[in-house]
Amino acid sequence: MLYPSGVLAEAKPPDTEQADTKQLPTEGRSHPPVLLLHGFIDNRSAFVLLRRSLLRHGWRHVTALNYSPLTCDLRRAAEQLGRHIEEVCTRTGHREVDIVGHSLGGLTARYYVQRMGGAARVRTVVTLGTPHSGTRIAPALSAHPIVRQMRPDSDVIKELTLPAPGCRTRFFAFWSDLDELMVPVDTARIEHQDLNAQNVPLKGVGHLALPVHGAVAAGIRQALTDAEGAQPTAGTRESGGASVA
């Protein structure tokens, strides 16, 4: 009963590979599995449209992970993510996965990759409105420990500034000039000399609209496709701005 609000995690994510969604015949047959990670006080339903978009364009393994906001430590959420990735790899026969994370979900994915050895399993991380440098949101929201970990002065954010030599995972950070929960808005960009990261600016997309906007979904599909066969290159790059309002 509490699961739909995100207060309790699911015991087992649904088998989204069996979704009643028509797949296109030729595209994406070799794509790694995609894991979708929602944001704070949300649940996997935030990714209904994106999951459908990926399946329709040929992705075969798309799984949305529910986790509980009662989890008070992002590090524990990252551990849970690691266990789920191992389960997905075992079930699908793939050796690596791609991750799309909205807000807190993106920060959890990045922490797993950078600080817990997840680069060995994660090919690509796409983040949507994720506070990579921390966000100065309303102080009242900081009553929750995991929200405090998303503030600029938190130990988690400081850990993510540490060197990450040899990290092979490719990052795409989508950030919007209209993201009301990212303060300042460019905190959703990745700035790290050791990471192979590309920042993708958007115009006119609010925080909650990022995982459901059709044009953003197209950009995510393109990012996941571009990552195939790409050679690891450290350093941050900037994409041209895109208006999707």
Residue ranges and their predicted role:
Residues 34-45, 49-168, 174-175, 181, ...:
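Serine-dependent carboxylesterase/thioesterase catalytic core
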Residues 1-34, 57, 232-245:
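Flexible, membrane-associating and regulatory peripheral segments of lipid-active enzymes
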Residues 3, 182-183, 210-211:
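Short, solvent-exposed loop/turn elements at domain surfaces
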Residues 28-29, 120, 166, 194:
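A generic fold-level signal
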Residues 211-225:
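Post-His helix in hydrolase/transferase enzymes
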Residues 6, 10, 15, 25-27, ...:
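Conserved serine/cysteine hydrolase catalytic core
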Residues 60-61, 193-210, 220:
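Catalytic histidine neighborhood in serine/cysteine hydrolases
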